[in-house]
């Protein structure tokens, strides 16, 4: 299936990684987001998890496996994905990648390719984060991403239930000192 070859290569090298991200949500890869739906994701996670478990036996090392999801999923899709994350004992979820929803942009920017990140992503990302927190097993690691550029936005993700945070756009616009500002509180 789509994405399995790359995932196999990554998992085979997992003995040198701290964790592996299955990014099934990139808006820049044609048909990749289709993996988040129905039988596609079930088959994909089953195949990847089987390979992951086999390699864990070979290398005698558990490298956590996390799935990075899109903010554009419906609540029903997030629920179904949560059930599969539980079923296949996936270690964690990264909530979320960039959005393909450009409705908040002015007309002149709506046709630009790629995903929208940063502050415009916060509401959607937090909604998906909330659904994931409510539906995956408590032992899963939840990584909050999307619109983090201050202590307040970081704290909001943690208050919803994220265990860890990732940020990128905040670093681009505010520089590395944004990390110190967040950690100062």
Give names to the regions the model predicted.
Residues 7, 33-41, 66-86:
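Active-site glycine- and acidic-residue-rich loops that bind
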Residues 28-40, 84-138, 174, 178:
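Glycine/Thr-rich beta-alpha phosphate-binding loop at enzyme active sites
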Residues 55-71, 132-144:
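Short beta-strand/loop segments at the ligand-binding rim of alpha/beta enzyme cores
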